[in-house]
Amino acid sequence: PLQVNSLSITPPTTPQDLAIAMGIAPSDIVSASLNGSDVLGVGIGSAPLGTFFPREGNTFAILSTGLAESADTPNDSDSLSYDLDGLNSADGNDMTQFILTLHTPEGINCASFDFAFYSEEFPEFVGSQYNDTFTAEAPLNVAFDSEGNIISINTVFGVTANNGTTYDGGTTL
């Protein structure tokens, strides 16, 4: 069973704290911004979430279109929803955005990061207008599943249930 530590997800004091939670050295951070996103949609995890995080170090960043602090609660509800203030997509749906500008060391021309995509909308909203997505733009989207699809509930490749979080579905790394 999922072990829940109510203190394992905390809100970041600054956007830079999210970057540091991802293992980015403070000296490599040029700027960090939530670009108007509701701070309730982001968190710093300090205990295992599902079977993946943290991968390195003791912390990781959480970006959510709902309450980030809910990510480590038991999956014992039919619905998990919260309307965030702040940014919305063109369709009026909640959106959380984290913008990083990093110092690039001389001779380095690539970067990598691990992510897992979790959603409460799986499987009941697959193929519907409700379509959680994840993108990472550098400057164009670089987050795709192994079939080349954008990461979303409607593509569902690699999304499985019983992922050790409060969410109904999630991807592997």
Go through the PLM ranges and name each one.
Residues 2-173:
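Aromatic (Trp/Tyr/Phe) and Gly/Pro-enriched flexible surface segments
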